[in-house]
C-alpha cells in the first residue's frame, strides 16, 4: 500500500452540500454541479458521509442496505455519473463504511428476529446483558424481540453490533466493500472500526462504561488485514482511513504502518477535546493551548518516528466549527482560518478539509432550540436543564457544542438559503451566509491560501514526506514544528492568539526564506514578532 502522501481530502456532508430538486436536502446532482469548484480548490479525494438507505436514527450511520442509494440523494445512475465526472477532474471518492453495526431494519437483523439461526449468529445475542453502557446513553443491550434475550448495540438501540468472529459476517461485509470498489470508488473511511474486536464471551466491565472490553482489541488488526487482503489491498492507489474511538498512539501506529497491510491512516479526536471542561463535552471553556500543543507534538513525533500515518483535520460533521472554538472571529476570521489551515496542511499526515472550511464558514448562531434538529443536542439540552442549568445557560452550551453547527447548508451565495436550495432546507442556513459565501470568498484570502497549501504539498516532498519534530516547546502562544527531509528543513510557526508573540528564530533559520505566511510583510530576523494568528513557514535548503 504505497499511499500518495501529496493528496488532500475534502469531506462532503451530502445532505447539506447542494440541493437540485428543491426538497431542501442536498443530492448527488448537486455535488456533480460543484465538481468544477472542487477542482478549482485542488482536492484529490472527496469523502462522502453515508448516503445508503437508512431509517435515519443516526444520520445515516444506521444502514439498512449497504449496496443501494437512499432515493433522497438520487439513484445509482446519478452516483455512477458523479464518480465519472469527478474522475475527469482528477478527483476520486471515498465512501463511509459503517461495518461495526447495521440498522435493526437491515434484512440480516430482521431475519434473525424471525428466528433464523444463521442470521442470529451475525449479532451478539445473550441471555443476560453485561454492564456496558451505550455511547448514546443507557445500557448497551436491548431486548431481542420477545425471546427474553438481549442484543448488543454500542450506539443507538436501532444499531445492532455485527459479530466479526463469524466468518459469514466478514464475507458479507467484504462483498459490500468490493461492490463499491467495482463502482470506481478509490477510498473508504471505516467508521469506529477499532470497536469490531469483541471477545467470544462478553462479560461485565465496570471500568470506563465497558470501553476496555471492546476498544482496540488485538484481534481488530487481524480483521483489518483480512479485509485488506480480500478487498482494497491489491490496489496501490487506494486510500483508507479508520475512525478510531478512544484510541492510543501505539494502536494507530499498528493500524497505519504500510508493512502491516491494515489501513493507510487513522483518525483520532483527542485534539478536539481541549475545550472540554473536565473532559465533559457539554461545557463552555477556553481551549487549553498547552494540552493542544502537547497532543500535536506527542502524536506528530511518535507517528513520525515509528512510521505511522495520521489523518489531519480541524472540522467534521460531528464537531462545531473550529473557527468558533479557537479563533477571535469578530476581529481575525481570515487570519485565524489561514493559521489553522497551515498548522495541519504543513504537518505530517493527510489533511482533510470539511466543506465550507475553505471559505471560513462559522457556526450558525441560531436563536432558539427550535432551530436544532440533532437528536444528541436536543437530548443534551434536556440533560443540562435536569442538571440545574438555566434555559439561557443550557442554550449557550448547545450553541457552542452542537453537531448541527457544522451540518448547516453550504453557503454558496447571498441569495435565500445561501444558494443551497430553492425549497426549505432540512436545517436552517447560518446567519453569516450573506457575507461568508463562495461567491464572495472564492477570490478572498482564505480560499486562495487553501489552494496554495494544497499546491505546496504536491510540489514539495518535505511537506508530504518529511519527518516531524517539535519546536519552541516552551512558547505559551505559538505552536511550532519542524519538518526534515534530505538535508532540507522547514520551520512552521503558528500564533494561536489574537495578540502578538515574540519568537526567537533558531540561528539556522535566520538565513532561510519565507515559504509562506498569512501576512504580506513577513521578514526574518533573530527575533520576530508574530502578528495575531500569524503563520510563518521558513525553509532552509
Regions found by a protein language model. Give the residues of each.
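Active-site rim elements
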Residues: 160-166, 170, 213-214, 322-335, ...
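Acidic/aromatic-lined carbohydrate-recognition and catalytic surfaces
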Residues: 2-178, 182, 195-248, 257-258, ...
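Beta-strand-rich binding/interaction modules
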Residues: 500-518
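Loop/helix patches that line or flank the sugar-binding groove of alpha-linked glycan CAZymes
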Residues: 2-5, 222-224, 231-237, 254-256, ...
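C-terminal beta-strand-rich structural cap/linker in extracellular carbohydrate-active enzymes
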Residues: 525-541
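Hydrophobic residues within beta-strands of alpha/beta enzymes
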Residues: 46, 188-190
